Amino acid sequence: IDEADRLLGQSFQEWVSTLLDALEPHGPSDRLCAPPRLWTESDTWARDDIQVPQPSVQKLLFSATLSRDPAKISALRLRDPQFIRVRDGAEQGQFALPSSLHQHMLICPTNEKVLHLLHMLHGDQHIRQALCFTKSVDAANRLVHLLLFFEEAWAQATAQPPLHIHFYSSDLRTSERKQLLRAFERGQVDVLVCSDLIARGIDLPDVRHVISYDVPVDMAKYVHRVGRTARAGRVGDAWSLVEEQEVYHFKRMLSEAGQLEHIQRHKVHSGAFDPLLPHYKAALARLAQLYSQQR
């Protein structure tokens, strides 16, 4: 069972009890039968009259943040459970992240957050193959419109092709989600903006960057976001755009998880936004016009 903690936290039409009932052995109880190795060739009468119990299943649960709640774990009817944690030898803390993951933090005023993101896409970092997470579907939708308006203005002014930016959310049909993920895997999508729906249980092998446009509220959500990159030994980068009023909470969260020392802080000098500003203002005006028409 992958993403075990998420599945345990939701009923999903009582899937746990339904599955486990189907997996239970149907033979006699272990307490009433001798193990198979005790039978001999002469014990044909015993073989005919007494059934050897069928073997039970082996249950393997995988998650980056597996629950330790006894009530939830007991629902799985585990026998002699063993807990195995995989991490780097020197790593401490409750959460383990791969050594090939590079974590970055940019502290910015709220009104400059989009400019910081645009600078990451068109500045020195030149970020592509990125997942960009927002706090909600509405926030993701608004950000995508703003980025698309900017790309259109930027392409007209610079004669450069616009970035391919798309919106991924629970509002899309399943077929549309699959089509969008295939396009990302083929390199046809530069930035995929989404809420936390995609952060768990979806395997995208070529995610180079994860951007938390809105920082997560807890460490478990942070781990599942950044876990979309640096997979299977690949190198990946996780970027967090932290508003000034969020710095204390964000740094404390990382510190308690033993990750603060691994994060690199970046600072963008004020003049770096100058080439972006005219096109950003034009995009803002178009966004305001769009939302005024929808009211």
Task: Label each region the model flagged.
Residues D69-R79, Q94, V144, L197, ...:
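Short regulatory helix/loop adjacent to the ATP-binding pocket of P-loop NTPases
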Residues E3-A4, W15, S136, S195, ...:
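Walker B catalytic acidic pair
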Residues I1, D5-E91:
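Post-DEXD/H (motif II) to motif III coupling segment of the RecA-like Helicase ATP-binding lobe
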Residues L97-A155:
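Conserved interdomain hinge at the start of the Helicase C-terminal
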Residues P25, D49, Q54-S56, H122-I127, ...:
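Arginine-glycine-biased low-complexity disordered regions
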Residues V193-V210, H224-R234:
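SF2 helicase motor core recognition
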Residues F133-D138, I165-K178, S195-R200, E243:
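Conserved helicase motor
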Residues Q82-R87, Q129-L131, E151-D171, V191:
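Conserved RecA-like helicase motor-core motifs
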